Design a protein with these regions (language model features):
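One-carbon transfer enzymes
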Residues: 1-233, 239, 274, 281-318
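A short, sequence-level motif marking secondary-structure junctions
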Residues: 244-251, 291-297
Length: 318
């Protein structure tokens, strides 16, 4: 049995490490070239792990280009894991592994098929998500389900904390099924039919904050798009600021009667610098900005952020 691995995102690292530690016959890992990975959110360096286990690492521009397809065919792989890879694989690429290719999608399929499921569930304020290990098929996220893990979402989660749990569940699900796969078995069950819409792709420009939303929606947007993603953003005093961290002030705690959405109420001051920030009114209630960064790299947090003379100023959409 000859196994291959395709991945560039950090969510694939724990699973690959566990598979290699188990002594599975991984003969090649494919990842993105550094100059391509540099523009992708959540990209991880697979070189140290491959060096540690002596596994050949191949850097590609696209998994579907002729060079990558020739490489895969030449490797003569029986089974390929595609974990932490955002590109849809072409039918010809999928056909290059004798037994098929296995991927993971960060939702409880068939719900939330499509792009950026982690970001979308946080933006929508959902309380439960999950991860699905599937056989890759020509249709997007439509292959047979091998295993699933349910993951609760708390109000304190961000895209980063959710991705940590997704990465751990990738590892756990793969290790549960690996012995069967190495015996040549093909476990899985068809997905139920779903009429739900496929989640659309997200782009950096989609992170523009709409202060006319409820405070909870603004808070959800910020935690959904924080690092390793490009971040939610807005304009104040003619400068574009990315909001990396915020706190929600619901109900009476964030009362904003008579204030326009986007108006800065003033600072939060505390001996605990991590609690310092600036309070901004939303359509109802408010959020406290805890960490912001200007386009020129100026990072404000703690006391430095609280001491900005922003009270009475308003965030706008540029």
């Amino acid at each position: 049995m000859k196994l291959g691995w395709v991945g560039f995102h950090m969510e694939g690292i724990p699973a690959l490490e566990a598979v290699l530690e188990a002594g599975a016959p991984v003969v090649a890992v494919l990842t993105l070239k550094p100059e391509v990975a540099a523009s992708r959110s959540g990209a991880a360096d697979y070189r140290p792990l491959c060096r540690r286990f002596g596994v050949p690492l191949h850097e590609v521009t696209s998994i579907n280009d002729p060079e990558s397809r020739t490489l895969l065919q030449g490797l003569g792989l029986d089974l390929v894991f595609v974990i932490g890879w955002s590109q849809i694989l072409a039918p010809e690429t999928l056909a290059s592994a004798r037994l098929g290719m296995i991927g993971a999608h960060a939702s409880l399929l068939p719900k939330n098929r499509g792009s950026a499921p982690i970001n979308w569930v946080l933006i929508r304020g959902e309380h439960i998500t999950g991860n699905s290990l599937i056989w890759l098929a020509n249709a997007v996220d439509a292959g047979d389900v091998i295993d699933q893990t349910e993951l609760p979402i708390t109000p304190y989660d961000t895209c980063a904390t959710l991705y940590e749990r997704v990465a751990a569940s990738n590892r756990d699900m793969i290790m549960r099924v690996l012995p069967r796969l190495l015996r040549g078995e093909h476990p899985g069950r068809p997905q139920p039919r779903s009429e739900g819409a496929v989640l659309p792709r997200r782009r950096p420009a989609d992170g523009l904050i709409d202060w006319n939303q409820e405070a909870c929606a603004v808070y959800n947007m910020i935690r959904a798009l924080t690092k390793p993603y490009p971040g939610a953003f807005g304009w104040l005093d003619g400068r574009r600021w990315t909001v990396w961290q915020a706190a929600l002030l619901p109900g009476a705690a964030g009362a904003t009667a008579g204030l326009a959405p986007g108006e800065v109420l003033g600072p939060v001051i505390s001996p605990d610098e991590s609690a310092c920030g600036q309070v901004v009114a939303c359509r109802s209630a408010a959020v406290t900005l805890l960490q912001v960064e200007a386009d020129d790299g100026t990072l404000l947090r703690g006391r430095q952020l609280a001491e900005q003379d922003w009270a009475g100023k308003s965030w706008d959409h540029g």
